């Protein structure tokens, strides 16, 4: 019985530590790059990705944290 209670207590402590670590993770602010961590933009922002071309040749993808529900158009 003691072993069961001890095991339950250890599991509760471990889960609390994991939740606290996730809450401390810093978010990415507006207009900062989020290519490597797309799900880490601050609240109210989304990670929007674009394929970059140089002289018609694809040079990779870059992602930025932008405001939700905002659309950007080329000029």
Swiss-Prot record:
Subcellular location: Secreted
Native source species: Lycosa singoriensis (Wolf spider)
This protein's name: U6-lycotoxin-Ls1b
Stored InterPro entries: Spider_toxin_CSTX_knottin (IPR019553)
Pfam families with a match to the protein in the record: Toxin_35
Signal peptide: 1-21
An example Gene Ontology molecular-function term: toxin activity
GO cellular component terms attached to this protein's record: extracellular region
Domain of life: Eukaryota
Cleaved propeptide residues: 22-25
Keyword Endoplasmic reticulum tagged: no
Mod. after translation: Contains 4 disulfide bonds.
Keywords linked to the UniProt accession: Disulfide bond, Secreted, Signal, Toxin
Organism taxonomic ancestry: Eukaryota, Metazoa, Ecdysozoa, Arthropoda, Chelicerata
Tissue expression remark: Expressed by the venom gland.
Sequence similarity: Belongs to the neurotoxin 19 (CSTX) family. 06 (U6-Lctx) subfamily.
